[in-house]
Amino acid sequence: HSTGEVKALVGGRGDKSGNRTWNRATDTCRQPGSTFKIIGCYAAALDAGGKTLASVQDDAPFTVGSKTFNNYDKSFGGFTSIRWAITKSINIVTVKTLQDIGVELGYKYAEDFGISTLTDSDKNLSLALGGLTKGVTNLELTGAYATIANGGVYLEPKFYTQVLDHDGKVLLDKTETQDSRTVIKDTTAWLLTDAMKDVLTQGTGKLARFDSQIAQAGKSGTTTSNRDCLWAGYTPYYTCVVWGGYDDNSKQSGKLTSYPKNIWKNAMSRIHEGLETKDFVQPDGITNATVCSKSGLLPLGGICDNDPRGSMLTTEYF
């Protein structure tokens, strides 16, 4: 992700049947599910929406107009922080956060991340959950996550640096024309990454974690009836997004939802063999403080630390 170079791309399974055949990584648009929570909501919320990882929403039944939003397990957790909502992929908190910061802001950030398939009809609260008109390509979703891994700087995915003829003359050159732009602050990127590290240790991505001291972060995603199952993850070295589903959009059984995580785990484990142990570098400007987990604010003495359910104090990065 530090160069934008595409090291490997798989457009389908099975034996190759020809050249320039349908490539599901570049040609197919599919619904990204909860992987889009980071791209269409939380990145904007932390970067420009006045939210922090400690900010809370009331995870409770929520209806806007005729649309009722639910969590995937149909349960509700009350006042919940953004960090925990990312870790456990809680829909209600995400939708309420996008409502707070404004759909237009989330939409703009998603475009800045390199998502080119958005339409005006996507300017609604379903954007927070990846409910898109056309969907996204795996390549562009990978580029978006690589932006976070790269400290907030988007680099256009490139498949070559130069193409030369037999005389050494340059025919195609990507060394000077690669699109590059800052999408989010490096501090925002680090905070998102820190939250997504929890996804692999405490949340919906435990199955994706490979056995290594190299830092890993990521986000899961599924759509209705498991028609799309995704795992978007990265390390300080590489970003990889895996999608699984049927071309005809058929339902998948629940047991198949783990396949993208297992594929990511096995592939990334091999790719990182022999690489130096590395963590994501914390940029200047990051600090931490003790807050009340039920308000996201500085605690009041004798209240947050005296809850009958136990102390509500927690330490968070800002």
PLM segments and residue spans:
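Conserved catalytic neighborhood of penicillin-recognizing serine enzymes
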Residues: 50-106, 124, 166-198
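Mid-domain, small-residue-enriched loop/turn segments at the edges of structured enzyme/sensor domains
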Residues: 68-70, 102-143
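Sec-exported extracytoplasmic/periplasmic mature domains
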Residues: 41-50, 62, 87-91, 99-103, ...
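Structural recognition of the beta-strand scaffold that forms the well-ordered cores
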Residues: 6-9, 55-56, 84, 94-97, ...
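Secondary-structure capping and boundary motifs in well-ordered enzyme cores
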Residues: 2-3, 28-36, 74-78, 82, ...
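Active-site SXXK
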Residues: 4, 31-57, 85, 144-148, ...
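A penicillin-recognizing enzyme superfamily signal
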Residues: 6-10, 15-28, 135-317
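Short, well-structured active-site flanking segments
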Residues: 22, 36, 46-64, 101-105, ...
